[in-house]
Amino acid sequence: MSKQRIYEYAKELNLKSKEIIDELKSMNIEVSNHMQALEDDQIKALDKKFKKEQKNDNKQSTQNNHQKSNNQNQNKGQQKDNKKNQQQNNKGNKGNKKNNRNNKKNNKNNKPQNQPAAPKEIPSKVTYQEGITVGEFADKLNVESSEIIKKLFLLGIVANINQSLNQETIELIADDYGVEVEEEVVINEEDLSIYFEDEKDDPEAIERPAVVTIMGHVDHGKTTLLDSIRHTKVTAGEAGGITQHIGAYQIENDGKKITFLDTPGHAAFTTMRARGAQVTDITILVVAADDGVMPQTIEAINHAKEAEVPIIVAVNKIDKPTSNPDRVMQELTEYGLIPEDWGGETIFVPLSALSGDGIDDLLEMIGLVAEVQELKANPKNRAVGTVIEAELDKSRGPSASLLVQNGTLNVGDAIVVGNTYGRIRAMVNDLGQRIKTAGPSTPVEITGINDVPQAGDRFVVFSDEKQARRIGESRHEASIIQQRQESKNVSLDNLFEQMKQGEMKDLNVIIKGDVQGSVEALAASLMKIDVEGVNVRIIHTAVGAINESDVTLANASNGIIIGFNVRPDSGAKRAAEAENVDMRLHRVIYNVIEEIESAMKGLLDPEFEEQVIGQAEVRQTFKVSKVGTIAGCYVTEGKITRNAGVRIIRDGIVQYEGELDTLKRFKDDAKEVAKGYECGITIENYNDLKEGDVIEAFEMVEIKR
């Protein structure tokens, strides 16, 4: 049964919510607003006060009604007798009419004058809200507004009745009247941070799994370490063997669960790593024993220290002949990470992620550190947490990977996620299994929200869908206003900078990516490129395939488009060719940064250029033993040649890039198949072809220097 709120209780007793709030405050009960739920003991106390008063009022009104009815009965009897007397007196009254008229004139002059109302007493204490006006403050003090205006004038402040007062002025005026003032703290329900509370003091809080972030320099073995822990292989599926997105996984060790956030290690993902440190309880710093401390290692240390998160150092690759764990320990002491063996407090675990040696020791250390931290959460509370990743899926719509930090998340919950909202339609765990509930420290992917949130946004569950909609829409509108204000400010700032620097050149960039985290990280990396005389200006970022709107914007702003793991649709391709807009498509983030930086320095001297020669649509698939998947295709653009490179595109996102294995027309091998013809295609080392996929053929053409 849901608890009764203050306004509902007031409505039941036909009272104002303010009366109930005032009474609760007199009982020393903290009240935020009329939406606050009442406990059973609070309702009983209020019943004693207000229902007793109402009984007395009802009793008094009943007595008055009895008295009134008795008086009416007596009056009826008296009226009969008075009729006779009136008839007799009428004759005498006619003679007195003149005298009465004269008396009325005299009485008008002799009427007692209305006495002025007694002045209201000035209260000893008043409360006020930020932005209170002169008129409102005068009403609280029970004085005329003109009095306040005079006092302000004497203080050298010219104000009118609608002028807002600051804290200092309010205190000066109140002091003049001998009144104590206190500012009311107004709780803004749109601020999601107010729903995040420390659960250590909650008597109902129970132990929760630790959230662990793996950090370190690129290629030091972070993903391999996580794979070794989960007994899975993720690295092989990543472009260039490097983790591109934050993944959240949960494992069980000695009966206790541990949640891992796999944060990419390259400097380009600084923003993602910083976000990981904000939600984590323990940081695993992976350092290769044969490589030592590198720039991203230092960056990871700084992020963990800033978030005040305990660090466990995993010295990886100890099985290599060139490994030197002692050198790693020595180098890390310069950054305040002193091993326990050397009298410090930092735990060092030597291990090999590839062979699995030392993994059990690492998990044991994580358990010990988590035990000392006393990590707790209350699964009975409303669910709150953070967005790990978000993307737009063509079939499922907007989806978000969430980490539940407190409470329990359920399918069907009304939820506000950042500046968007919705009702959870489906929930999937890290193993891809559909689940109905998710407790604290559990990573899940949800669908049912109406827009793609930002990675790192907070989410809060509300019991009322209307409230969630109202808060979500309000936050969305506020974010639009803020973006407009920021864009105006940035424009003015840029104009001033241009005036100072003279002929300043801007490189306008539009970034489109497959997931929000990659887009954010790429934008942050490009903004850090420091080339004298040229500034990178990110004019638009979004998730999804490159479309005609992006090309139009790039053309209007004289900018370039960077596609990260996405492809342009056919309309965007035609528009880019017609408008001569430069589109750069990449799958590995290093190449983007290197290419842009080289171009800005004037050092870019490409030897080869990719040229798309055709596209074919997969109409039907056939699985043949010892051959694999054969795709029955229809060439929609250009031509498909046997020696061309190919990439598989699904919903605008690149799924695979490789080589053609076979190209056939009916049962015969073909060197090329032109537009408008059907063909059979098999892809080398790839069988996950589906109907509707687009096979794009390309060639590398040498560019003359």
UniProtKB/Swiss-Prot annotation:
It comes from the Bacteria. It is found in: Cytoplasm. Keywords: Cytoplasm, GTP-binding, Initiation factor, Nucleotide-binding, Protein biosynthesis. Residues 241-245 are annotated as: G2. One of its GO terms (cellular component) is cytosol. Residues 59-77 have a biased composition (Low complexity). SUPFAM superfamilies: Initiation factor IF2/eIF5b, domain 3, P-loop containing nucleoside triphosphate hydrolases, Translation proteins. Residues 216-223 are annotated as: G1. Residues 40-124 are annotated as: Disordered. GO terms for biological process: translational initiation. Residues 41-58 have a biased composition (Basic and acidic residues). Residues 94-108 have a biased composition (Basic residues). Residues 316-319 are annotated as: G4. NCBIfam families: IF-2, small_GTP. This is Translation initiation factor IF-2.
